Amino acid sequence: MTEEQIIRLEHLTKVFRNNHTVTAVDDVSFDVRKGEIFGLLGPNGAGKSTLIRILTTLIAPTSGTAYVDQYEVTRDPESVRAIIGVCPQNSTLDVELTAYDNLDFYGQLLNVEEKVLEERIWELLKMTDLTDRATSRVSTFSGGMRRKLEIVRAFLHRPLILFLDEPTIGLDPDSRFEVWQQITKLNTEKTTIILTTHYMDEAERLCNRIAFMDKGRLIALDTPENHKRALPAGDLIDIGFDRIDDRVLPAIRESGLVTSIEEKEKSFRISAKNGNSVLPAIIGIFEKFSVPMTSISIHSPSIEDVFIYLTGRKLDSGEGEQPQPAGGGKAS
C-alpha cells in the first residue's frame, strides 16, 4: 500500500450458500485514504455490511484480499482488531448500566490501564455532552444520546480506523444531526472513518469520498462533487403552474436548451447544463403562451440524483436487494 492508503481491497468476493447462492460482495476493489471519511452508500442488500464484516475480521472473504493498515485481514486478524473500532448497526449498549459504566466495562475488556481509562471516559463524555448524565442509566437516554455514546465507546482506545455501520438509522432528524456533529468531531482527531449508510444526505454531508454499491458490486467511487459533475443532466429546474397550454412542452423541447423534461402534476422538472442561463428563455416560452407560473426553483443535482442515474431507481425502492441467507447461511 502507498503511504496515503490505510485500507486496500483487491477483487474481494463473498458468497453465502444455503438453499440458494447469494453473492453478497462481488469482485470489489478500492482503497481508503488516511484521515478521510469514506462512505459506502447503497440500498439494503447492496453488500455494505458484509464488506464491513470482512474488514473487521468477523468473516473471511471467499476470494480476493483486504488490507487494513499493513495487515491482511485473514492472515493477521488480531493486529487488525487492535487498530480498529466498530460501532455496529444494532446497539450493544447495556441499557441497565450507566453511561460511565458502559464505557468503563468496555475499557476493561480492552485492557486499558485504570488511570488512563478514567481520564479517557470523562474526555469522551464531555465530547458527547453527556457529562451531566454520566451516572444515569442508558435506558433513560434518547435514541440520539445512546447512539453518540455507542460511537465514542468504539473510539475509547483511540483506534486508527472507526467503522460506523448505519450510525443514524431509526433516529429522528434532530438526533441524526447530533450524531453527524459527533462523527465530524471524531474525524478532526485524524481518525479514518468508514461509514455505511443508505441516507443520501448523510453521505453527502459527511463523506470526503463515496462508493456506491448495488447488488454486491462497486458501481462508482469519487467525491460527492465529482459524482454530481459526472451527471449529463446538469441543473434541475422545477416550474409549477395551475394550468398549462399544450404548446408549452413542445416549445421547450424544440428550443434545444434542455437535456430532458419530466412531466408531473401541475409542474415540470427540467434538466439543463446551466439552469441560470436557460431560465429566462424558458420563462419567455411560458409568457408567450400566457401560462402563469406558480413557482420556480433551480437546484444542483443531489447524491440521490446520481444514484438514480447510475441504477435507474431510487435508493429506497427496494428493487435489487439481495436476500440474506437464513441464519447467516453457509459461507464459502
Where does each model-flagged region fall?
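Conserved ABC ATPase "signature" region
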Residues: 104, 108, 115-133
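Conserved catalytic motifs of ABC-family nucleotide-binding domains
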Residues: 158
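ABC transporter nucleotide-binding domain
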Residues: 181-273
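Catalytic Walker B motif of ABC-type/P-loop ATPase nucleotide-binding domains
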Residues: 162-165
